[in-house]
Every structure is written in C-alpha cells, then in structure tokens.
Amino acid sequence: MAKSKNHTAHNQTRKAHRNGIKKPKTYKYPSLKGVDAKFKRNHRYALHGTAKALAKARAEKSA
C-alpha cells in the first residue's frame, strides 16, 4: 500500500484570505495587567501631576 500524505498547504491561503488576514486590534490604553507594581504606583502619581499642570495651564490661559 502507498504511504499516505502527511501534509499539504493546498487551499489554506485561500481560506485565510477569504475573510482577510487582520492585524490584532491595538487599543489607545493597553492594559497594565501584569505590570510591575512599583511602576504602576509611580505612574499613578505621574498622571496626577500631569493633570494638575494641565489644569493650571488652562486656568492661566482663560484668566
């Protein structure tokens, strides 16, 4: 008896492209899950300082 075929790529690219090969979605704010706790803590304070500076700049601009 003849040996059976182990693998073929026939039709695989056609199947893949029927719905289009899409890039994974990237989001504006990626999750911080799994990020170092020390970094996340400092990041929180840094964001707060940035928000205060922006608020002050807006107040000075409008005044």
From Swiss-Prot:
Q: Where is this region: Disordered?
A: 1-35
In the UniProt record, the signal sequence range is: none
Taxonomy of origin reads:
Eukaryota, Fungi, Dikarya, Ascomycota, Saccharomycotina
Alphabetical list of PANTHER family matching this protein: 60S RIBOSOMAL PROTEIN L29
UniProt GO cellular component terms: cytosolic large ribosomal subunit
GO biological process: any one? cytoplasmic translation
Under the heading InterPro entries, the entry gives: Ribosomal_eL29
Q: What is this protein called?
A: Large ribosomal subunit protein eL29
* Residue ranges, compositional bias (Basic residues): 1-26
Is Kinase among the key words of this record?
no
| Subcellular location(s) per record | Cytoplasm
Main function = Component of the ribosome, a large ribonucleoprotein complex responsible for the synthesis of proteins in the cell. The small ribosomal subunit (SSU) binds messenger RNAs (mRNAs) and translates the encoded message by selecting cognate aminoacyl-transfer RNA (tRNA) molecules. The large subunit (LSU) contains the ribosomal catalytic site termed the peptidyl transferase center (PTC), which catalyzes the formation of peptide bonds, thereby polymerizing the amino acids delivered by tRNAs into a polypeptide chain.
Family note: Belongs to the eukaryotic ribosomal protein eL29 family.
Assembly information from the UniProt record:
Component of the large ribosomal subunit. Mature ribosomes consist of a small (40S) and a large (60S) subunit. The 40S subunit contains about 32 different proteins and 1 molecule of RNA (18S). The 60S subunit contains 45 different proteins and 3 molecules of RNA (25S, 5.8S and 5S).
The keyword Ribosomal protein belongs to this UniProt entry's keyword annotation = yes
Question: What would be the name of the gene that encodes this protein?
Answer: RPL29
